[in-house]
Structures are given as C-alpha cells and as structure tokens.
C-alpha cells in the first residue's frame, strides 16, 4: 500500500516506514504530523475520489527538525562592467518517518 501526499509544497510517494525530506514544517522533534492525501493505491484498488480520500490520513513522526539541504551557489555577472556577485543558499528541511496510512 502506498499513497501520494502533499508535503511542504511538493508531492511525495510514501509507504509505511519511509523516511522523507520535506520543506521545513512547524513541528518539533518527536511530534506527529498529518499530511493531506492525493491518491491511495492498495494492491489493485486505486482511490482518487475526494470523498474517499477525506477518510484517509497519513501520519508521520518528525525525526529531525533542523536538517539542511545541499549548498547551492548563485552567481550574477555583468559583462564589461566589473559587476559580479556571489550568493549561497541552503534550504531548511524536516526529516519525517511515515508511521501509518489509514
């Protein structure tokens, strides 16, 4: 059984026991969070109807609330003027473990 959930502005395919990275959530380590479901597949049975999906919930436990993504370097350059700028960014992430699809 797996589900497609909306987590942190993205859609993720999850099963029970999966550990996923999502954009920073407002939750502390050890908290339980619930994600809205877009699709559920259980063997040959596929659930897409909004009325049926309202009954389904995906629960996850926050494993780490202070993770960071890889460093991304941004460069801006203007030719013949000597203008150059460098900037870096690291996305703040939350690591969650899927505990239940019910």
Swiss-Prot record:
GO molecular function, one term: rRNA binding
UniProt-recorded name of the protein: Large ribosomal subunit protein bL21
Gene Ontology biological process: translation
Family the UniProt entry places it in: Belongs to the bacterial ribosomal protein bL21 family.
Subunit structure: Part of the 50S ribosomal subunit. Contacts protein L20.
A Pfam entry, by short name: Ribosomal_L21p
Taxonomy, superkingdom: Bacteria
Function, as annotated: This protein binds to 23S rRNA in the presence of protein L20.
Species of the source: Bifidobacterium longum (strain NCC 2705)
Name of the coding gene: rplU
InterPro entries tied to this protein: bL21-like, bL21-like_sf, Ribosomal_bL21, Ribosomal_bL21_CS
Keywords tagged on the record: Ribonucleoprotein, Ribosomal protein, RNA-binding, rRNA-binding
Record's GO cellular component terms: cytoplasm; ribonucleoprotein complex; ribosome
């Amino acid at each position: 059984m797996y589900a497609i959930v909306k987590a942190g502005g993205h859609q993720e395919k999850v099963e029970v026991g999966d550990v996923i990275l999502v954009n920073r959530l407002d939750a502390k380590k050890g908290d339980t969070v619930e994600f809205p479901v877009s699709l559920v597949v259980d063997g040959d049975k596929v659930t897409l109807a909004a009325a049926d999906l309202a009954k389904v919930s995906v629960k996850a436990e926050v494993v780490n609330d202070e993770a960071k993504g890889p460093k991304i370097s941004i460069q801006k350059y203007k030719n013949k003027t000597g203008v150059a700028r460098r900037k870096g960014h690291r996305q703040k992430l939350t690591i969650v473990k899927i505990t239940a699809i019910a």
